[in-house]
From Swiss-Prot:
Keywords: Cell membrane, Membrane, Transmembrane, Transmembrane helix. It is found in: Cell membrane. It comes from the Bacteria. GO terms for cellular component: plasma membrane. The chain crosses the membrane at residues 35-55, 81-101, 102-122, 135-155, 164-184, 223-243, 268-288, 302-322, 328-348, 352-372. Pfam families: BPD_transp_2. This is Uncharacterized protein MG120 homolog. Its main location: membrane.
Length: 517
């Protein structure tokens, strides 16, 4: 029971810290903004689909449901999540350090090309390990990707060449060189004249057949790699000194230099780690599906017209997710629904691309919400404009209570260390003190808000112009605010009864005045 009680208090404390702690404000706003805009993009996409002749309104919902009726679609969906996640992680890691790695596509292609060339041309045909071939593939592709990433890093760090320019140039160089090597050395003897691809990778080296037990489970292996990479990056950036130094470098180069950090070192290392993630991405893209080939279908086959779009998808997702690994996984999942679910739902490629573009555009303009402040509009709607000051005071009081609790727990811990006392497990004393302060703060806020609302409308009853067009709307809003405030008082008590009576008499007086009009 003590353990459960402690966990309950701990959960409530963490929840309050998220809602009221000042240092969580930016995180709260970014989550509100991203969530609001994703919902808005769903609404706009729904009406867009409904407006297209011949497409039913239920088609939008089928994007998220119909793909689960087919095993192949489910596998493609899981694999697509892994691809988007790894691409976004590769971009976002560099972005956290203040460098814009636009070369994910080229680094991925370089890693894939190096891995295929080594396995198909350098390794003897008799070398087909019973176990561990996939690890060799991953290591080879990481080596190829990291090499290219280090070239971009060296140009940026040592020669002051803009990383965007050098990465874009290298993207094209790598795609064209890869096409030449594939066409010259590892192209199948008999092939479709309209398509351009390499020889299949042997099963012993492909993620598609990871083991005898996991044959054709490349989608699962891909998902495990992506989730493991996201967890690793999250832990590295949040809980390690190295991660904090990387973030510090991204936040302020001059500040990091003043603190004694080698900015060049951390920028270079960020490219290296991004290259490792690009190598993992290459393994998933080119060896985790049943083709197991280095294909050029997404860049124009024989007439190469572009670089792989995978890296640019990762840039969009990384920016939408604000470079957070957890949010990258969530956004990748949402985008994958549209990418994979559009075809089973009956949407053509153009409509699917339009829906995807709308979702990405809306989610990417989250900064607009900082000025619109939808969360503030909801507060105004529920407790009225005149209670904004009371709400701000309540937030400040809650933040002070949280800070006091954190500081008291820290002092208790230091005192135990100093006095060499035994650790008291599941001690809830400080949490209980905090809950009492919280209840007192809530009660004060509720009473102040109720009285402010009553006083305002009593004054409105005397001076307001009921002929004003917006008066009826204001009165309806007032009724909503009454219900919202009365929900604060749990169970029947004298305060709630008195408040209900005051609201009822005020409503009656306002209604009579409206009838007199």
């Amino acid at each position: 029971m003590n353990a459960l009680n402690y966990l309950k208090h701990r959960f409530l404390f963490s929840k309050d810290k998220f809602w009221y702690a000042p240092f969580k404000q930016k995180q709260r706003r970014s989550i509100y903004s991203t969530f609001s805009l994703i919902v808005l993009s769903f609404i706009v996409s729904f009406f867009l689909i409904v407006a297209i002749p011949g497409i039913k309104g239920g088609t939008f919902l089928e994007i998220f449901t119909r793909l689960f009726k087919d095993r192949i679609n489910i596998e493609n969906f899981a694999r697509q999540i892994a691809i988007y996640t790894l691409a976004a992680l590769a971009f976002s890691f560099c972005m956290s350090v203040g460098v814009f790695n636009i070369g994910i596509s080229g680094q991925m292609m370089a890693g894939a090309n190096f891995g295929f060339m080594m396995i198909l041309k350098v390794f003897p045909e008799s070398f087909r390990p019973a176990f561990g071939g996939q690890i060799i593939t991953i290591l080879l592709m990481i080596l190829g990707s990291v090499t290219v990433a280090m070239v971009v890093a060296a140009l940026k760090v040592f020669f002051k060449v803009n990383e965007v320019v050098s990465a874009i140039m290298l993207n094209w160089v790598i795609v064209l060189v890869s096409a030449y090597l594939v066409g010259t050395y590892i192209k199948p003897e008999k092939t479709d004249t309209s398509q351009f691809y390499s020889i299949e990778l042997p099963d012993a080296f492909a993620l598609y057949n990871f083991s005898d037990v996991q044959q054709k489970y490349g989608w699962l292996t891909s998902l495990v790699i992506a989730i493991a990479a996201a967890i690793f990056i999250a832990v590295l950036m949040k809980f390690t000194v190295f991660g904090h130094k990387l973030k510090s470098t991204g936040l302020s180069v001059t500040g990091s230099q003043a603190a004694g950090y080698s900015v060049k070192k951390y920028q270079f290392l960020s490219f290296v780690i991004s290259g490792i993630l690009s190598g993992l991405l290459a393994a998933v893209v080119y060896t985790a599906s049943f083709e197991k080939q280095l294909t050029f279908s997404d860049v124009g086959d024989f007439g190469i017209t572009s670089v792989p779009i995978t890296g640019f998808d990762g840039i969009a997702i990384g920016l939408i997710a604000l470079n957070s690994p957890a949010r990258i996984v969530i956004v990748s999942t949402i985008i994958s629904f549209v990418t994979i679910g559009a075809k089973p739902a009956g949407l053509n490629a153009a409509t699917a691309s339009l829906v995807l573009g709308i979702m990405m555009y809306f989610a990417a303009i989250y900064n607009l919400m900082i000025y619109i402040k939808p969360w503030r509009m909801i507060v105004k709607l529920n407790i009225s404009k005149m209670n904004e000051a009371a709400y701000d005071e309540f937030q400040n009081e809650m933040a002070a209570n949280l800070e006091t609790l954190s500081f008291q727990r820290f002092l208790d811990k230091q005192k135990r260390k100093h006095d060499k006392e035994r650790m008291v497990w599941f001690d809830t004393k400080r949490f209980e003190e905090y809950q009492k302060k919280k209840q007192a703060t809530l009660q004060t806020f509720h009473e102040n808000s109720s009285q402010n609302l009553l006083q305002y409308w009593k004054q409105q009853l005397l001076v307001a112009d009921v002929k004003r067009l917006t008066f009826k709307w204001d009165f309806l809003t007032f009724k909503h605010q009454q219900k919202y405030i009365l929900r604060w008082y749990k169970g029947k008590n004298k305060k709630q009864t008195a408040l209900e009576n005051e609201f009822a008499s005020l409503n009656e007086a306002i209604s009579q005045k409206l009838e007199e009009k």
